[in-house]
């Protein structure tokens, strides 16, 4: 995610090499987990200017030009910010899982959620 006037906003996709050395606004915990893993695996040395505890705050700071950030695509759908969202040129994905106790009498909400997730995963050919 970049500001609208950031040089990377002009590209259709962004490579890992493109973000090496860029100023970053990152969530405090994500740097140690998913984004940090992405950086380590691809030998990226970010210039972390700010660590933020809330994703939307990070996006607002990016909008104002404080740096760029890396966030899950699911979070970025229909966001109310004037930012540029670009995919990576290289393939990168994360695994999501649903864990629950398989006990009789699942709540209606959980039952509906599991049905939805299963249908969606099949439509996306994930299972």
Task: Indicate residue ranges for each PLM-predicted region.
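Secondary-structure junction motif
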Residues: 8, 22-42, 106-114, 121-124
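Short beta-strand-to-loop elements that line the ligand-binding cleft
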Residues: 26, 45-54
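Residue-level recognition of the GNAT/N-acetyltransferase active site
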Residues: 3-5, 27, 101-102
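Beta-alpha-beta core module
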Residues: 11-12, 56-105, 112
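Conserved glycosyltransferase catalytic-site signature
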Residues: 32, 54-55
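Acidic, Gly/Pro-rich loop/turn segments at junctions of secondary structure
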Residues: 1-21, 73-80
